[in-house]
Amino acid sequence: MREKLSLWAIFCLVVAFLPSQTESVAVMSVDLGSEWMKVAIVKPGVPMEIVLNKESRRKTPVAVCLKENERLFGDGALGVAVKNPKVVYRFLQSILGKTADNPQVAEYQKHFPEHQLQKDEKRGTVYFKFSEEMQYTPEELLGMILNYSRTLAQDFAEQPIKDAVITVPAYFNQAERRAVLQAAHIAGLKVLQLINDNTAVALNYGVFRRKDINSTAQNIMFYDMGSGSTTATIVTYQTVKTKESGTQPQLQIRGVGFDRTLGGFEMELRLRDHLAKLFNEQKKSKKDVRDNLRAMAKLLKEAQRLKTVLSANAEHTAQIEGLMDDIDFKAKVTRSEFEALCEDLFDRVPGPVKQALAAAEMSMDEIEQVILVGGATRVPKVQDVLLKSVGKEELSKNINADEAAAMGAVYQAAALSKAFKVKPFLVRDAAVFPIQVEFSRETEEEDGVKSLKHNKRILFQRMAPYPQRKVITFNRYIDDFVFYINYGDLSFLSEQDMKVFGSQNLTTVKLSGVGSSFKKHSDAESKGIKAHFNMDESGVLILDRVESVFETIVEEKEEESTLTKLGNTISSLFGGGSSEPSANVTEPVTDEEEVTPEAGKEQDQPEKQEETVQEKPETEEGKEAEPQAEEQKEDKEKAENQGETESEKTEKPEEKTTDEEKEADMKPKLQKKSKISADIAVELEVNDVLDPSAEDMEGSKKKLQDLTDRDLEKQEREKTLNSLEAFIFETQDKLYQDEYQAVVTEEEKEQISGRLSVASSWMDEEGYRAGTKLLKEKLSELKKLCKGMFFRVEERKKWPDRLAALDSMLNHSNIFLKSARLIPESDQIFTDVELKTLEKVINETITWKNETVAEQEKLSPTVKPVLLSKDIEAKLSLLDREVNYLLNKAKFAKPKPKDKAKDKNSTSESSKANSTDDAEKVIPPKTEDGAEKVKPAEEPPVVEEKAEETILELNPAENTDDKTESTESSKSENHIEDEL
């Protein structure tokens, strides 16, 4: 009984952990650019695919239009921007995580004077004020856009999606990254990771060229010029050995250079201003076109088109109908004029390359190729200047410049999701900005003079790999104190970049409870105050915890024999163990070196970092080689364990003599060092950009949910309005069709026609202002009125097919019944009851059909029919069930054995003839299907072998009926596997 219960418990446990069939398994990525976004998904059956928007385009403008009663996104929002630019918000990336006094906020206001930016007095950031009721922060607007991207992905995937990987520029600092995470939280998205867009591009490049990656390092530079910024990245590809998955390819970010404001949008603004100047010079209007916001929006749209055309043509004519005051504009612009307008921008093209080389401490001779990414790299002058600066023969264009980041990010999303299994590809991203810890400590000189000494400890050097955990130990504090988390040396940034960067001070950390922990453990030796830091996969620095660590010496119990240990372990499993909670003194003490300001790059100091506990071996940090210190520690432990094992082997189970016992008593007891840790209370004070409070976040989520509900209500109303309008017009037309006129009386026809006319008039006068509820009521009333007419028409349409099917079934059933009754009694497999039951069903069905059809023919077409399609289907189902029952019985019936005694006793010729006839009538036994398959000339079917490593194990199981196919077909038709 106990065994049965155990098996049942295991079965329930297994079922509990099986994935639900309705559970969402699709994941998405959003390549969030300054002007455009690309969305990609992974789902079962669709390995990696770019999502098409409602206009069937592969990229969508990052724009949202907020009118008083509706929202528009993407291309719809851009269409409104030409007519009413005040209600359209775009290029939000440049003001995320920025305070009101940041130069980029002023630059944004200059480019978009139609918007009214106000300072948030609580956080110091900005928000858009359209009216007293309509005020939105950049995070809220970005949250709307991210929610729209999820809507596109869900429509494309045909299932709900909540997990996403979002790209951000590599130069985003802590405040900017937190702002994107806040926007995603407002949108209700679960962010698996914020991945740098240059890293996503590098991952996409490596995934599709993994066969070309070997142990020899390959250095490749990606030059990405988008709409708003430019980034140059040096990436090293090579294979490395890992404990979890053997030798795997790896990419490592070695150097990053960037220019925050160099991009295609700045070129378009120069063209826009040039076109405005040309229009003013034509003097067709006394007004200055630059004072007209709508006209400037039209000029910007034309400048965007003009830039694209001039990339392929030497000259082109810009033209806009009704630019201002119904005046048309037309002017010719040459490529040379465009290049002259942007000359200073082209001079900045080599800048990011030089920064990346300096960060990586490499030269261009070590770079194998330079690959172009981003739409603005299509400008010929950009390519010419870049080619000269890198000194290569050519620039590579062997990846999709627009979609590479989205595809790399969605690969990472699949790797982070538990629903997919992907081929491992190790990613070592790098922190662009160094981070350090600063604190002050009172010191006493030899002459007794006390002074305050300011100390710095580097947490993450420039280009330090992450995700990574670090521990800093404060050894000389015995009371509460304060330390600061700040950015490190940013001298590599220009003066303008430093202004845009914002505050260099990240967080003030106030510790309390240090003194009380020392008093509590006064008899133990202090090992310092340890602060545990974690830079996660998104590049966001988190202070996990702070603890006060003490070391104490405890007497170790005498070594127990192996059998005693085993007995204690088994007894504890069955309730014999102690019920008291274990104390926090069980961890062995390990010396953690304090991070010093002289520390080199993180990859050169592996002993000073704490290994991150991994849950998924596919992620980057879990696949990296163990640090040197960890290996030394393992070797030491292994040696100790080996020594213990040898000592145990030498022990004998013989009883000790009295002298031995005395000698054992005289031996000193073993002593062991144990660690005691006490958590320290932490108070964090953010110094760069304050995060929204929990109350503000809930308010933002409610604000967006209200807008979403309003949009859904509007869509529902429009859908109901269209349905009502279509029903009126279609029904009015049907009243004049022959099949409908045949089933209605003149009185009924006039009633329906009159009600439809009244509803049509109401629609023209009041319907377009009516609410959804009233529209649904009107539609329901009309459908109820016409229900009888539609029912009669539908029934008459179904009769021919249904009756023909019934006649066919009756015919086949009769033939089957006659054949069954012709079977000799000695071979009969059906009972009389079974055959009589089938005969009864056939006769009753024939009688019902004849009587019902005859009754229906007497009725007028305008009354409710007695011959109903559902009744015919019920009769069909009953006949089919009875016949199938007998067919299945015949299929599995065993032939009766031959009567040998009767054949032996037969003496007359006639008897012999009869017995021979009987023998001929015996049905031979059916051979098993499996026996027919295995023939001498053919191999038996085998289980299919997978040619490659399985990727995405989420295809629906194949139909088991297909297993009866031949061996050749089973070998040729392998399972289709989604491969990333």
UniProtKB/Swiss-Prot annotation:
Gene Ontology terms, MF aspect: adenyl-nucleotide exchange factor activity; ATP binding; ATP-dependent protein folding chaperone
Please give the function described in this protein's UniProt entry: Has a pivotal role in cytoprotective cellular mechanisms triggered by oxygen deprivation. May play a role as a molecular chaperone and participate in protein folding.
Instruction: Report the sequence similarity comment from the record.
Output: Belongs to the heat shock protein 70 family.
Region feature Disordered, mapped onto this chain = 558-682, 894-980
The UniProt entry's GO CC annotations, sorted and at most eight, read:
endoplasmic reticulum chaperone complex; endoplasmic reticulum lumen
Q: Where is the composition biased (Basic and acidic residues)?
A: 599-656, 896-906, 918-949, 960-980
Q: Which GO terms describe its biological process?
A: negative regulation of hypoxia-induced intrinsic apoptotic signaling pathway
Q: What is this protein called?
A: Hypoxia up-regulated protein 1
Pfam family example for this protein? Answer: HSP70
Q: According to its UniProt record, where is this protein mainly located?
A: endoplasmic reticulum
Question: Which intervals of this chain are the motif Prevents secretion from ER?
Answer: 977-980
Bias (Polar residues) occurs at: 907-916
